[in-house]
Amino acid sequence: MNSWTDAIGEEKTQPYFQHILQYVHQERLVGKVIYPPQNEVFSAFALTEFKDVKVVILGQDPYHGPNQAHGLSFSVKPGIVPPPSLVNMYKELSQDVGFQIPSHGYLIEWAKQGVLLLNTVLTVEQGKAHSHANIGWETFTDKVIHQLNLHRENLVFLLWGSHAQKKGQFIDRSRHCVLTAPHPSPLSAHRGFLGCRHFSKTNDYLRSHGVEEINWQLPL
């Protein structure tokens, strides 16, 4: 099993998935602003093929401000100020792996190296966090994690916050590395996200299993 088409292609034919697409399409039709733009909803899968995934960073739902979300969890488009959670990720990276903090929040270089930046819900209405939380996306992303868990081995799952941890509770810890910490949001980062050293631990694990490490440094 090499591609997302192999792993989750059948989901497209399922009634629940048809319902999601129909719902989002309808919302856009009546003039609601939905993020990310239609052509970027599935960017995480386009940028990181199933067989190339090394690390999964699980987010919740997309950023709901203008020009932020582009289909990768925690990432924002070039030219947009990094949001607070990402600022804390950068802080941890700088302490953990000597990361130089860039002026942007565009994480596409991670995705190209095999970091699947996956939100558990893939769309949101402008200004309304979690507005699409119950339209079926969770079923789809559960299937994504299930297939990675089953058909890949020696992946690293970074689960930050209770939502991500609950989502990843069925991951087989004998075949994969699961690292948990509080969410990097300013509300919780000081409770153990800062100092978690997940980025160096990820590379330690990959290296010990003969997998090329992630170069976390982003273009400045």
Curated annotation (Swiss-Prot):
PROSITE patterns: U_DNA_GLYCOSYLASE. Keywords: Cytoplasm, DNA damage, DNA repair, Hydrolase. GO terms for biological process: base-excision repair, AP site formation via deaminated base removal. The active site is at D61. InterPro entries: UDG_fam1, Ura-DNA_Glyclase_AS, Uracil-DNA_glycosylase-like, Uracil-DNA_glycosylase-like_sf. Its EC number is 3.2.2.27. One of its GO terms (cellular component) is cytoplasm. One of its GO terms (molecular function) is uracil DNA N-glycosylase activity. Pfam families: UDG. The keyword DNA damage applies. It comes from the Bacteria. It is an enzyme of class 3 (hydrolase). SUPFAM superfamilies: Uracil-DNA glycosylase-like. It is found in: Cytoplasm. Its main location: cytoplasm. It catalyses: Hydrolyzes single-stranded DNA or mismatched double-stranded DNA and polynucleotides, releasing free uracil. Excises uracil residues from the DNA which can arise as a result of misincorporation of dUMP residues by DNA polymerase or due to deamination of cytosine. Belongs to the uracil-DNA glycosylase (UDG) superfamily. UNG family. This is Uracil-DNA glycosylase. It comes from Glaesserella parasuis serovar 5 (strain SH0165).
